[in-house]
Structure formats: C-alpha cells, structure tokens
C-alpha cells in the first residue's frame, strides 16, 4: 500500500472514531449518523476559508515584529482559537441550530463535535502528508482530542442556549460556549507555540496533556448527564 494512503488513513481514522464514539453516547438515538455526516463535511470544507483568513492575519501581525510571547498569544487565541472555533460555531448556527429537531443539549454537543472533527480531519491529512505518519500518530492523541474538547464544550452551551425561552439567556449561553472553546483551544496552542519558539519554555508543551485530560473528563461527564 502506498505510504500516502497509509498516512491518509492514519490522519482520518481518529476523527471517524471520535465521531462514532460520541454518536453512540446519544441516549435519544434521534440523530442518525446520516444526519451528522453533512455537518462533518461542512467542517472539512470550512478549513479552506479559515486557512486563508489565518494566513492573512498571520502575515499582517508578522509585520509588527512582536516578541515571541505576544506573537504566541495572538497566534493561539486569535488566529487559531477565534478563527477555528468561530468557523465551527457558524456551521452549527447556520445549518442545524434553527432546525426544530435540534432541541437538546446533546444535539449541541454531537453536531458541534461533528463540525470540529471534519475540520480536524482535513487538518490532520495536511500535516500527516507534509510531515509524515509519525505526526499523524501524535495528533491522534493531541490535536484531535483538542478539537473535540474545545468544540464539545462549546456544543454543550449551544445546546443549552437552544433550550432557553428568553433571548437574553440564549445569547448568554452562545457567547459563553464560544469563549470557553476559544480559551481551551488558545491555551493549548499557546503552550505549544511558546515551547517551540523559546527553548527556555520547551517543557511547557507537557502541560497540554493535563488540559486535554481535564477538558475531556468534563466533557464526558456532561455527555453522560444527557
């Protein structure tokens, strides 16, 4: 089997695994997988505009010659966190949020995770093909769970927003979920950017694992509640 095919399979498998894993946790069983896959595919295609926007912003901020700390913060929380979680938020809000069948917290979690995994799938393929299958193995236990955790928490609050009767509370939960996703995603990336950009902080990268474990535990607890 060609090495490229193997690399693609390594990149795609963890995203499909997590998609079916969280789908299996839906006690209502009303969200069939064929309803979820379109959102997964929207997430895949959304990586194109996100990549273009991130590249433009990155080129702009590099003109200011920020130090590694400021650059890492902007790259993590604005370029990666805000843009990527914003794209997933838009997909769910635009394509499923107003559907009358989208009416529970678990709906929010499942569909937002589906959008995030579609995005992570193409991102994984790109990194794995350009940097090798070893990167794909590493991302299966780091970047993919990161997308799941950040977007899953956002999805919890999107679902909670949909169950509200008051527009003010609905907007509160939508904003709350988005901010939490950006903070989780941004903190993860900030540690990686800083550890890669300054040898004195190289050990910081190990902190991504407590972040992933805590975030996934909290998300899994919420999933089991609903």
Predicted stretch roles:
Residues 1-226:
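Hydrophobic alpha-helical segments at protein termini of multi-pass membrane proteins
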């Amino acid at each position: 089997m060609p090495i490229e095919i193997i690399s693609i399979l390594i990149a795609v498998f963890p995203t499909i695994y997590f998609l079916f894993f969280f789908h299996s946790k839906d006690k209502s069983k009303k969200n069939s997988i064929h309803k979820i896959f379109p959102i997964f595919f929207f997430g895949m295609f959304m990586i194109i505009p996100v990549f273009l926007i991130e590249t433009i912003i990155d080129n702009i901020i590099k003109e200011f010659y920020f130090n590694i700390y400021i650059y890492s913060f902007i790259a993590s929380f604005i370029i990666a966190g805000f843009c990527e979680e914003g794209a997933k938020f838009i997909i769910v809000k635009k394509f499923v949020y107003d559907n009358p069948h989208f009416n529970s917290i678990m709906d929010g979690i499942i569909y937002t995770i589906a959008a995030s995994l579609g995005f992570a799938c193409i991102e994984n393929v790109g990194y794995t093909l350009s940097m090798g299958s070893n990167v794909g193995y590493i991302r299966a236990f780091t970047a993919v769970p990161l997308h799941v955790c950040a977007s899953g928490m956002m999805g919890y609050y999107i679902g909670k927003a949909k169950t509200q009767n008051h527009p003010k509370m609905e907007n509160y939960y939508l904003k709350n979920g988005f901010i939490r996703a950006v903070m989780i995603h941004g903190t993860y990336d900030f540690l990686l950017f800083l550890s890669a950009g300054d040898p004195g902080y190289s050990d910081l990268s190990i902190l991504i694992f407590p972040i992933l474990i805590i975030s996934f535990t909290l998300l899994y607890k919420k999933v089991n509640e609903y």
